[in-house]
Amino acid sequence: MKRMLSALLLAGLFLWSASQALAFKPAVLFDMGGKFDKSFNEGIWNGLEKFRKETGIKYREFEVTQEAQREQFLRKLASRGSDPVIAVGFGQAAALTKVAKEFPKTRFSIIDMVVDLPNVQSIIFKEHEGSFLVGVLAAMKSDSAAVGFVGGMDIPLIHKFACGYVQGVKHINPGVVVYQKMTGTTPAAWNDPARGAQLAKTMYDSGADIVYAAAGGTGLGVLQAAADNNKLSIGVDSNQNHLQPGFVLSSMLKRVDVAAYEVFKSGQDGSWKAGFKILGLAEEGVGWSLDEHNSKLVTSAMKRKVEQVRKDIIAGNIKVHDYMSNNKCPVQ
């Protein structure tokens, strides 16, 4: 009898778990560049794949290839009962604002922008803090006293990366020149590796020996240009050190993988909450990468200095200005 009861309980637990999995229908709308952009979108995908492998729960997905699809795909996911729905990137904000109002019972999360609605969770990062750290690395590594920055689309968010980077560089050596260029003013700026390579080469030819790219797929061109010209680059969002081993000084890590994973996990266990989440150094939401692909480029002194700066920023001893607080950077 006890064995029968145990078997029934196990069967009931299995059926309950199965029904819960069936009822839980997470989804994601990737931004332009797609889930294999080796940068921002791919970081999101890595986090969601971790969730899928751990739980066995599949998720629906769409990729934006043109502006009109944002609203269309978000609405399609919500109308099919997907919940929670992740909108990837700041470009989804306008469409999400509209669609989230149409589906007030659906939980939405947007990564990299704020949408202030009762059924939306907004996750943003202190990119300026992580960029400060790689700026410190660049200044310590540079032999030419000149470094560069290539941004993607010319928007305040990317100036936030640039400003943090310049502050980090100047913190070590105020005399270092920082060349800065944005790729363009339309979403196409995120996926133009040839232009990224061209901008980086111009900086290398002008004397820069390290260029930081915060430009999505365009940044791959910067990394390639560094390798082609025997210079160094700095990657962004995901760990890009392996893409050009020995030529990527480091990558400014933006832990969108962790953020995406937590959206699905909290959605499943009931702890998901609307509102705002801001992830910086203290929350381990940003950082820098050190692995077998760049370990020979980073000296012990550099590691010690960056670690001390990281602690000082968290403690409030070093203040890193957020460009988006006033659309200005105190240093150039």
Where are these predicted regions, by residue range?
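Bacterial N-terminal signal peptides
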Residues: 7-17
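Positively charged n-region of N-terminal signal peptides that target proteins for export
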Residues: 1-4
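A residue-level marker of the well-folded mature domains of exported/periplasmic proteins
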Residues: 22-332
